[in-house]
């Protein structure tokens, strides 16, 4: 869950310094209809406010190509004010709350990603990767490895049916007690992946042997 929220993927490239933030609760008190009642993610990009209009248009085009309906953003000006399509929907109090919460600084750009819960993290992850590529933020001479653990055992498909997320033969954490008493989508499996620079090198699991 942490990897999906922070990086938008379970195969994160940790050379990319950009982090995804969950802004759903923040926007629950903002009167902006496209975000109302839906999960919202944000990505802060330092020293990006000076990019050209054409650069932002290319990012919007990329967002549309991957299935998004748009790509909102605000930039932080020298006087501390915000500029961008969403700025007018934020009260002075909400602007200050956002600044404090994300430690926004002059020349930062904050991108907003909003969609349904099943795909919003994936979309945010693709935007994060594209920003890293376009801004040349990824150190190609580095190897960053990580273990991804605590995979959810089940998820629901578009029809609400329970399906396995990965290996159905893995042991659930909590074993039979978890299967009998926990909400299925909250059960975690004894599974892991080894990831390097966004590539899965290997995976493993404790088999359901008892």
Where do the PLM segments sit?
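Class II aminoacyl-tRNA synthetase catalytic cores and aaRS-like
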Residues: 1-210
């Amino acid at each position: 869950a942490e990897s999906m929220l922070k990086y938008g993927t379970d195969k994160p490239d940790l050379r990319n310094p950009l982090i995804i933030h969950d802004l759903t609760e923040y926007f629950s008190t903002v009167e902006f209809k496209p975000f109302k009642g839906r999960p919202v993610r944000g990505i802060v990009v330092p020293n990006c406010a000076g990019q050209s209009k054409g650069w932002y248009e290319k990012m919007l085009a990329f967002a549309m190509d991957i299935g998004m309906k748009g790509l909102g953003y605000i930039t932080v000006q020298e006087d501390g004010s915000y500029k961008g399509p969403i700025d007018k929907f934020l009260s002075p109090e909400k602007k200050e709350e956002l600044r404090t919460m994300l430690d926004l600084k002059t020349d930062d750009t904050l991108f907003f990603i909003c969609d349904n819960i099943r795909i919003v993290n994936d979309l945010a992850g693709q935007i994060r990767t594209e920003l890293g590529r376009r801004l040349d933020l990824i150190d190609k001479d580095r190897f960053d490895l990580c273990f991804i653990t605590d995979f959810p055992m089940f998820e629901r498909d578009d029809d609400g049916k329970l399906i396995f997320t990965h290996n159905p033969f893995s042991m659930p954490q909590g074993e039979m007690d978890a299967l009998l008493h926990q909400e299925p989508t909250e059960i975690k499996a004894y599974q892991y992946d080894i990831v390097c620079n966004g590539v899965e090198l290997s995976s493993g699991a404790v088999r359901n042997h008892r």
